[in-house]
Design a protein with these regions (language model features):
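Glycine-rich, acidic and aromatic/proline-enriched surface loops and short helix-turn segments
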Residues: 21-28, 45, 49-61, 121-124, ...
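Non-catalytic, structured segments within soluble enzyme domains
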Residues: 1-149, 153, 186, 280-284, ...
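Short, well-structured active-site flanking segments
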Residues: 30-32, 92-95, 193-196, 219-237, ...
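Active-site loop and adjoining helix of the penicillin-binding protein/serine DD-peptidase-beta-lactamase fold
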Residues: 3, 7, 59-77, 135-147, ...
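Surface-exposed patches in mature extracellular/periplasmic domains of secreted proteins
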Residues: 14-16, 90-97, 133-139, 161-171, ...
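A penicillin-recognizing enzyme superfamily signal
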Residues: 141-164, 173-175, 185, 190-196, ...
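Conserved catalytic neighborhood of penicillin-recognizing serine enzymes
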Residues: 1, 45, 109-118, 124, ...
Length: 460
């Protein structure tokens, strides 16, 4: 319906102009004019055929086809655009050959400042709030400058100092208030080298961080942290999941199994509760899915983003209420007309109080005597580590009563890291960030003062 209304009000040329004036071309450039000056140092009206084709080629993937980060890929993409122009009859074969022969000189990348990955995410969100042709806008966001600077510092420092030895080239960090207000977002090691946002765009296997949803489904179904499951080798059909280092402890409590991230117990819990309930819990707390429902669901084979996963943990910090990540507080035109203003209020209740309290206790044990001991936060903290198969992804997502943060490390080509686990580098970086973000804070434990609200009845 919106597309039809736009076509009724504007000509095709006007619609194209609106689009080109706002679309992202990479390297921090929004709109054709800005991109022309950013890449070639000239106004758009003076672009050569080759330069125009290169900018057109950026629209498909402004980070991956970017001449700053991958000149060869950008040239190959430009050749594809020129060939398409020939086939469409817009230019001749001779013009295309001449353009390819002449090529161009690209301006060096600028020194970029500010939360570039966060800004890109805001631009991606804008179509949800404004329509094509909207006046220039003033946007008020949730970003906290000091937390953003600290997030960038700890992530890039860890990658520079420890990444080469560990075979880690990329990472991401997201921090948000318990209600989902994003305070810091870092989407990669170096924005100038790659504008691909690993915090919002990358979909990766969360590994054992997904056990959060197994735990919550079990607690909601009537299990308690002190209930016991067998920790021993298990086979489901032809699938034989294994514990880390093939170590098994026999009968263990649910609390100990989560704290120590025992795979065999997670699988047994998922089968006992029902994979459908586990998947439904993940979707309820914000994973976009589709969530796989095969036996391996318990070990985090469903790909998700760091932003989604951190938002799911925020539900617990928010006392069981919805905490969908958000970044835009208000949008105004330059003349001061309010286009959008976020309404504040308690989110919908997603989890019962008893489920939240029990989960806090279990997830606190992860940080005090479990796999995330290296986080080293002096205040009460809660979270879950995760490592995907062959050490391709390493995660830690955790929270306090004041702040929720998620950290991911891995490689864009999914090449395995050198034995990096969620309880190692991610947990340490998370701890460093949280200590800087909450210096000397006297935080109240989250296992008390739960508010009341309707929720599904317990059943086992």
């Amino acid at each position: 319906m919106l597309a039809l209304r736009i076509e009724d009000q504007f000509t095709k040329d006007e619609i194209v102009a609106f689009y080109l004036n706002r679309v992202y071309f990479g390297a921090g450039a929004y709109g054709l004019e800005a991109a022309s000056r950013r890449y070639f140092g000239r106004p758009a009206k003076n672009l050569t055929l080759y330069q125009a084709a290169m900018l057109a080629g950026l629209l498909r993937s402004p980070s991956r086809d970017n001449p700053h980060s991958d000149p060869d890929r950008a040239e190959a993409r430009t050749a594809v655009v020129l060939r398409a122009m020939v086939e469409a009859g817009h230019i001749s074969e001779a013009q295309a050959q001449a353009a390819n022969k002449a090529k161009t000189t690209v301006m060096p990348p600028p020194e970029l400042s500010g939360p570039r990955y966060f800004t890109d995410w805001i631009v991606d969100l804008l179509p949800n709030y404004v329509t094509v042709g909207q006046d220039d806008l003033v946007i008020r966001t949730t970003i906290d400058g000091e937390l953003q600077d600290e997030a960038e510092r700890v992530l890039t420092s860890a990658l520079a100092k420890e990444g080469p030895a560990m075979g880690v080239r990329q990472g991401a960090l997201v921090a948000m208030a318990p209600d989902g207000a994003v305070k810091a977002l870092v989407g990669g090691a170096d924005y100038r080298a790659s504008q691909f946002n690993r915090a919002t765009q990358a979909k990766r296997q969360p590994g054992s961080t997904f056990k959060l949803f197994v735990l919550l489904a079990a607690l909601e179904h009537g299990y308690r942290p002190t209930d016991r499951f067998l920790d021993a080798p298990i086979a489901l059909g032809g699938w034989k999941p294994r514990n880390y280092r093939d170590q098994y402890l026999g009968q263990v409590t649910i609390g100990d199994a989560v704290a120590l991230s025992l795979n065999s117990v997670a699988v047994r819990m998922s089968e006992a509760v029902g994979r459908g309930r586990v998947a439904a819990m993940a979707e309820r707390l914000g994973l976009k899915g589709p969530v796989r429902r095969d036996p391996s669901i318990a070990l985090g084979v469903t790909e998700t983003s760091l932003l989604e996963l951190t938002g799911a943990f925020a539900v617990l910090a928010n006392k069981g209420r919805a905490a969908a990540p958000y970044a835009i507080l208000e949008i105004k035109t330059r003349k001061g007309q309010v286009v959008f203003k976020r309404r504040h209020g308690p989110g919908a209740r997603l989890l019962r109080d008893d489920v939240v309290r029990d989960a806090h206790g279990v997830l606190n044990a992860v940080t005090t005597r479990g796999t995330a001991r290296r986080a080293g936060l002096p205040q009460p903290a809660y979270g879950k580590t995760g490592t995907s198969q062959d050490h391709r992804d390493a995660w830690f997502v955790g929270y306090t009563s004041e702040l929720v943060a998620g950290v991911w490390f891995g490689n864009d080509d999914r090449k395995p890291m050198k034995d990096v686990t969620g309880g190692e580098l991610p947990a340490r970086v998370w701890g460093a960030f949280m200590r800087a973000a909450l210096p000397g804070a006297n935080l109240k434990p989250l296992d008390s003062d739960q508010d009341e609200g309707p929720a599904p009845a317990a059943r086992r």
